[in-house]
Design a protein with these regions (language model features):
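N-terminal secretory signal peptides that target proteins for export/translocation
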Residues: 1-6
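N-terminal pre-ligand scaffold of iron-sulfur
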Residues: 25-105, 118-119, 134-146
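Short cysteine/histidine-rich metal-coordination sites, predominantly Zn2+-binding motifs
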Residues: 104-114, 124-137
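C-terminal motif of bacterial Sec signal peptides marking the signal peptidase cleavage site
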Residues: 17-21
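Long, non-catalytic terminal segments
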Residues: 10, 22-26
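Sec-dependent signal peptide recognition
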Residues: 7-15
Length: 146
């Protein structure tokens, strides 16, 4: 009988550890208290001259299409086939006139507090990382959504 109780206790401890270990970085990245979470879906054609910067590895472009993010989306060409998309609003500021991110090479900088965030992983020294969006490449079309 003691053996059965001990097995149940060990199983319970394992379940508790497993559940607590499942806190996802994506949950933290996408539950930013400063940036509203709303749905959108936009497409861009990489063949258009406007998006020529994105045809090359490490290409970066701020797109500001209607409905795409709060202040637009910053797209980053990771390796020619994989792209990252981030909200173009400072992740650690209440949205204001100074909270649109500036592109600086492979970083974006928040003009409000001068904090830099890496486009490679979306992180900087502040509490909240950049809010990321989903990107799917189909031929020369990028679909960006949240």
């Amino acid at each position: 009988m003691k053996f059965l109780k001990m097995r149940k206790l060990i199983a319970l401890i394992i379940v508790i550890i497993a559940v607590s270990a499942c806190s996802s970085d994506d949950t933290r990245r996408n539950r930013n208290p400063f940036i509203p979470n709303y749905s959108f879906n936009v497409e861009i054609n990489l063949n258009l001259p406007l998006y020529s910067d994105l045809r090359y590895v490490n290409g970066v472009k701020h797109i500001n299409l209607a409905g795409a993010g709060l202040n637009g989306v910053i797209l980053y060409n990771r390796d020619g086939n994989n792209f990252s998309a981030y909200e173009a609003t400072c992740p650690n500021q209440i949205p204001s006139t100074c909270s649109v991110l500036d592109i600086d090479g492979l970083y974006v900088v928040c003009p409000c507090d001068n904090v830099s965030y890496s486009l490679i992983d979306g992180y900087g020294p502040a509490e909240w990382p950049l809010v990321s969006y989903r990107v799917v490449k189909n031929g020369d079309i990028l679909s960006i959504s949240n």
